[in-house]
């Protein structure tokens, strides 16, 4: 990336977004953050505010607000990293209108602001775990060419947002890269929510509370560490134009395997509590990172064992 780039990060007080903001500031860029703090926290930016406050500007705003267009236009970012979203699959099922307002209308507001500002690139956080639907096991790990058949309104909004990015590129010349993220985990992930099993397990293991595994625990996910994901966002600043790019490890890890590894690392010798399978949960998921290697020069380097150990250490230090 060029020195002293002007960047804007939506959702920059959230889990992934705040880690991205830290990386951008560490590389001496000027960063605007847009976040309504509905799920993000200013605590995630405490270190950045203390060390680099002169290059960080925070705006508490909901991306559904039409004024976002003017705000983005005024800030004139060279690159927009669009991570703000309603990201809870269950909420998208129970509140589909709200989900669409945030993830579709909000995205259009951000894109309109970028158009007026003359932004050269938008890097978008898509969802590899939802846009492909229930993949054929023979197709795992999924490539970007896999048919897209979302099974939730959330997955649909991510697919629609990609089409808006494509259209804005064709009509207005705004370059984009959409990163289809696998199951991201790492420091600052919320241990109290419904999503983010690594953070949930970490919080419960360290507080000596039982961890719950739903179904038989053999459902698999592709767990990718947040620092690796941030590196993909940074690389996409100048690469991968016009593409959907998977950001995952290509490795399936079952929930049982995940729990066993984390329990060992935490020094806990007790089985997880078992609960009935949750309806609508994917049986298996993994993303092929081959396109990311070719077009972004990106590869994941953090193993699940190393990454989950770092998460446990972070939770201990944050207690």
Mark where each language-model region is.
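Hydrophobic alpha-helix immediately C-terminal to the catalytic Tyr-X-X-X-Lys motif of short-chain
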Residues: 160, 164, 168, 201, ...
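N-terminal Rossmann-like NAD(P)+-binding domain of SDR-like oxidoreductases, especially those catalyzing
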Residues: 1-184
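C-terminal substrate-binding subdomain of Rossmann-fold SDR/epimerase-dehydratase oxidoreductases
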Residues: 62, 203-319
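A conserved pocket-lining segment of Rossmann-fold NAD(P)-dependent short-chain dehydrogenase/reductase
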Residues: 92, 145-149, 176-190, 200-224, ...
């Amino acid at each position: 990336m060029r020195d002293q780039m002007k960047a804007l990060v939506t959702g920059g007080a959230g889990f992934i977004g705040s880690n991205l903001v830290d990386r951008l500031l560490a590389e001496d860029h000027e960063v605007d953050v847009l976040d309504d703090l509905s799920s993000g926290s200013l605590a995630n930016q405490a270190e950045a505010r203390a060390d680099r406050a002169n290059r960080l500007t925070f705006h508490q705003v909901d991306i559904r607000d039409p004024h976002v267009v003017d705000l983005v236009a005024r800030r004139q970012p060279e690159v927009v990293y669009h991570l703000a979203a309603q990201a809870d699959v269950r909420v998208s099922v129970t509140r589909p209108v709200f989900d669409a307002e945030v993830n579709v209308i909000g995205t259009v507001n951000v894109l309109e602001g970028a158009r007026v500002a003359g932004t050269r690139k938008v890097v978008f956080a898509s969802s590899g775990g939802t846009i492909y639907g229930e993949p054929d096991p023979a197709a795992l790990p999924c490539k970007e060419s896999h048919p897209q058949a979302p099974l939730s309104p959330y997955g649909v909004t991510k697919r629609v947002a990609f089409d808006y990015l494509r259209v804005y590129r064709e009509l207005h010349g705004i370059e984009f890269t959409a990163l289809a993220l696998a199951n991201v985990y790492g420091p600052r992930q919320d241990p109290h929510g419904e999503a983010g099993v690594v953070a949930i397990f970490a919080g419960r293991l360290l507080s000596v509370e039982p961890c719950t595994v739903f179904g038989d625990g053999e459902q698999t996910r592709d767990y990718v560490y947040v620092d690796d994901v941030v590196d993909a966002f940074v690389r996409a600043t100048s690469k991968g134009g016009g593409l959907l790019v998977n950001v995952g490890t290509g490795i399936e890890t079952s929930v049982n395997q995940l729990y066993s590894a984390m329990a060992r690392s935490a020094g806990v010798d007790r089985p997880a509590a078992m609960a009935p399978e949750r309806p609508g949960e994917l049986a298996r998921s993994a993303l092929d990172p081959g396109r990311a290697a070719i077009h972004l020069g990106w590869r994941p380097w953090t193993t699940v064992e190393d990454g989950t150990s770092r998460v446990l250490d972070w939770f201990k230090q944050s207690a």
